[in-house]
Design a protein with these regions (language model features):
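Conserved double-stranded beta-helix
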Residues: 1-57
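Catalytic core of Fe(II)/2-oxoglutarate
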Residues: 56-204, 208-217
Length: 220
């Protein structure tokens, strides 16, 4: 059992030449939401599978876009999965377990999780002290597999050989031009990756997300 943020989100998009290794997540997400870089976007697919017998822990997603109605992959959540492109579809992992069990006092980065065969329970320990135990049916296993998808061999070579990569300078210039065309007043950032005025303006210009005020306490 654990809490989960109520907000739906998109996973960070990768582009030819720009990814986690050289570009901050806020910029990748902004570029993805802007729709200005589809010619550079790396297409991906994910398979997510759950093995869980406890309460809540469902998966909410917006297959018709952020303005469309959400759908919920509900129970039974045992050996059940989805094939998705989570860089393009808003989604959220719903909180797991009963609300009164989601906080774990004493949990730390050094805490350990182990199975105790003598009691048929899973135990969380911190510095050797047991702070929480779970029955097997309360445990949830989630497997998330991701792959890049290519139309043909020419597209594979374009990515592998870096013959048509996007650069940070190209990305910033394209964003600035579009923001100004939309009427957004923004100055020329001297350091766009750290210029808070530019960052706020870019995020505000391209922010889009579903509403989640319909979530109740148990599910959210």
């Amino acid at each position: 059992p654990h809490r989960s943020g109520t907000n739906a989100h998109l996973d960070a998009v990768h582009f030819r030449g720009l990814g986690f290794e050289n570009t901050p997540t806020w910029l990748l997400n902004t570029m993805g939401k802007s729709g200005l870089f589809e010619d550079y976007r790396l297409k991906k697919a994910q398979v997510i599978t759950w093995w869980y017998l406890g309460e809540h822990g469902t998966f909410t997603y917006w297959p018709d876009g952020p303005d469309g109605p959400p759908q919920v992959l509900g129970h039974p959540m045992w050996n059940r999965g989805v094939v998705v492109e989570n860089e393009r579809m808003f989604h959220r992992g719903d909180p797991v377990g009963r609300p009164d069990e989601r906080d774990v006092p004493g949990l730390a980065h050094r805490s350990l999780l182990a199975y105790d065969a003598s009691t048929d329970t899973w135990r969380i320990t911190t510095d050797g002290a047991v702070i929480r135990t779970y029955r097997p049916e309360e445990m949830r296993l989630l497997v998330h597999w991701s792959a890049e998808v290519y139309t043909d061999l020419d597209e594979v070579k374009k990515v592998a050989d870096h013959t048509d990569d996007l650069t940070l300078e190209m990305a910033i210039d394209r964003l600035l031009a579009d923001m100004r065309a939309r009427g957004t007043r923004v100055g020329e950032p001297s350091d766009p990756l750290h210029d808070t005025e530019f960052i706020r303006a870019a995020i505000a210009t391209y922010t889009v997300a579903p509403t989640t005020d319909w979530l109740d306490e148990a599910s959210g």
